[in-house]
C-alpha cells in the first residue's frame, strides 16, 4: 500500500507555495485507490527554447507527479508567444513570427523528454483553441477582468507609473493563459513564483466558465544561477543548459558556492529531505568534505541528462584537468593559414571569446593562458606553430598556425 503521507512530503520538497494542498492529496489517493489519473499543466512559451537547469525545477516536480498518477499536459504556447509573457518585463516584447515559433517549439519537444516520461506526457499547443476563439469569445474573455486588477501586477504598476507603454495585448496574456486552463481542464497547474498572477487567473476563469473543478497550484522557487545572486538566465550567462556536454555540466556545477549547493540539492536532486539534512549535518560535523558533497550533486545532475558512466567520465576528466593539471582529452582543434596572428583574433577565431573586445577583457583579467602560461600582452602575435589556448579554468582550444 502506498504511503500517501510520504509521497506528499516528497511533493512538498522545495516547493515555494501550494494552493489547495488537500485537492492534490485527494488526487494522489484516488490514483492509488482507484487507478484514476489526473492532469498536470505547465505552459512554456517557445521564445527561448533551450532548456536550462532553471526550467528543470518545475519539470522535475512534474516528473515526480507522473510516478504517482499524473499525466503531464506540456503546453507549448505557440499562440501566446505572439504576445510574449510580460512578467518581469520593463517594455513590450517583440512579436515572433510563425516560423521561429515552430522551430523553437520543435526544440522544446526534443529536450523535455530528457526529464519527463514521454508515455505519460501530452504535448499540446494553445493555438488549437485560442486561434478559434474569435472576436466574440475574446470580448467575453476580456470582460471577465478589469484594468484595475491587471494593474495590481508589479511589472504593470511600475511601467504605468513610469509612463512606459503597455500594449493592450499584454493585458490579454494572463487572460489567455488562464483560458488555457479552462480549455485543458487540468487538475494541477505548475509554474515559478513569478507566475503567480497568471496561475491564479486559471483558477478564477475556471469558476467563471464553470468547468466543474478548480485547479490546484504548485509554485516552485526560481533557481539561483552560477553567480549565486541572480536567477538562472541565458541572458546573464549564469546557466547550465540541459544539452551542454557532460564535462561542462559537471564542471559548472562544481563551480557553485557551498551555500548555493544546498539550494540546488533541494531543487535539483532526487534525494529526500531527510537525506539532504543528514548530508548537510555530516558536512557541518566535518565527516564529509563539502567538495565531496558537491561532486555527488554534479554526478547526479550530469547523469540525469546522460547516464552514470558518462557522468563518471566527466568527473575523471575534471580531475585530470583541474586536480592533476593535465590537458583535456577532447579539445576542439583549429587551423589558421597565415604567417602570424594577433592573440585577440586567435581567441575569437577559436570561439574562446565572443568578440575582440571580450578577448581583450579576458587578457586584462589574467584569464588567458598559452601552453599553460598566463599572458598579459594583448598585442602578442602568434607565429607558425601549434598552441594550446585557454580562457578561464574550463575552456580550451588547440590552434595550429600554418
PLM feature spans:
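Divalent-metal (Mg2+/Mn2+/Ca2+)-assisted nucleotide/phosphate chemistry catalytic cores
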Residues: 15, 97-219, 224-226
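Buried hydrophobic packing segments
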Residues: 58-62, 175, 198-206, 301, ...
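Positively charged, low-complexity intrinsically disordered leader regions
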Residues: 1-41
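Short acidic, glycine/serine/threonine-rich loops at helix termini
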Residues: 84-88, 133-139, 228-232
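Conserved nucleotide- and phosphate/pyrophosphate-binding catalytic cores
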Residues: 205-402
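A charged helix-plus-loop insertion that forms the helical arch/lid used to bind
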Residues: 86-102
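N-terminal catalytic cores of NTP/NDP-binding nucleotidyl/phosphoryl-transfer enzymes
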Residues: 26-85, 190-196
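Short, hinge-like loop/turn segments at secondary-structure boundaries
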Residues: 89-94, 140-143, 236
Amino acid at each position: 500500500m502506498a504511503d500517501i503521507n510520504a509521497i506528499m512530503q516528497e511533493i512538498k520538497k522545495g516547493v515555494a507555495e501550494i494552493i489547495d494542498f488537500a485537492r492534490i492529496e485527494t488526487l494522489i489517493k484516488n490514483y492509488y485507490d482507484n487507478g484514476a489519473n489526473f492532469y498536470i499543466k505547465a505552459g512554456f512559451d517557445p521564445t527561448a527554447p533551450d532548456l536550462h537547469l532553471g526550467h528543470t525545477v518545475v519539470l522535475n516536480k512534474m516528473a515526480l507527479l507522473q510516478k504517482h498518477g499524473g499525466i503531464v499536459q506540456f503546453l507549448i504556447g505557440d499562440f501566446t508567444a505572439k504576445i510574449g509573457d510580460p512578467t518581469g518585463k520593463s517594455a513590450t516584447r517583440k512579436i515572433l513570427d510563425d516560423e521561429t515559433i515552430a522551430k523553437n517549439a520543435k526544440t522544446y519537444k526534443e529536450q523535455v523528454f530528457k526529464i519527463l516520461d514521454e508515455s505519460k506526457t501530452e504535448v499540446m499547443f494553445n493555438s488549437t483553441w485560442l486561434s478559434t476563439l474569435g472576436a466574440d469569445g475574446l470580448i467575453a474573455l476580456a470582460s471577465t477582468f478589469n484594468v484595475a486588477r491587471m494593474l495590481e501586477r508589479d511589472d504593470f504598476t511600475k511601467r504605468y507609473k513610469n509612463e512606459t507603454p503597455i500594449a493592450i495585448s499584454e493585458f490579454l496574456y494572463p487572460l489567455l493563459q488562464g483560458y488555457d486552463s479552462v480549455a485543458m481542464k487540468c487538475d494541477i497547474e505548475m509554474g515559478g513564483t513569478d507566475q503567480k498572477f497568471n496561475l491564479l487567473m486559471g483558477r478564477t476563469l475556471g469558476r467563471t466558465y464553470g468547468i466543474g473543478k478548480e485547479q490546484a497550484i504548485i509554485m516552485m522557487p526560481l533557481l539561483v544561477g552560477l553567480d549565486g545572486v541572480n536567477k538562472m538566465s541565458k541572458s546573464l550567462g549564469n546557466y547550465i543548459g540541459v544539452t551542454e556536454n557532460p564535462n561542462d555540466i559537471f564542471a559548472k556545477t562544481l563551480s557553485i558556492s557551498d551555500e548555493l549547493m544546498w539550494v540546488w540539492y533541494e531543487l535539483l536532486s532526487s534525494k529526500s529531505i531527510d537525506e539532504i539534512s543528514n548530508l548537510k549535518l555530516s558536512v557541518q560535523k566535518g565527516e564529509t568534505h563539502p567538495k565531496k558533497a558537491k561532486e555527488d550533486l554534479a554526478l547526479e545532475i550530469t547523469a540525469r541528462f546522460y547516464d552514470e558512466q558518462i557522468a563518471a567520465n566527466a568527473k575523471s576528466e575534471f580531475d585530470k584537468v583541474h586536480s592533476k593539471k593535465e590537458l583535456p582529452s577532447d579539445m576542439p582543434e583549429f587551423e589558421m593559414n597565415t604567417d602570424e596572428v594577433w592573440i585577440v583574433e586567435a581567441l575569437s577565431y577559436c570561439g574562446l571569446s565572443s568578440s575582440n573586445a571580450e578577448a581583450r577583457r579576458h587578457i586584462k583579467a589574467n584569464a588567458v593562458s598559452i601552453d599553460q602560461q598566463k599572458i598579459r600582452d594583448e598585442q602578442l602575435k602568434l607565429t607558425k606553430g601549434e598552441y594550446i589556448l585557454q580562457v578561464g579554468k574550463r575552456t580550451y582550444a588547440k590552434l595550429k598556425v600554418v
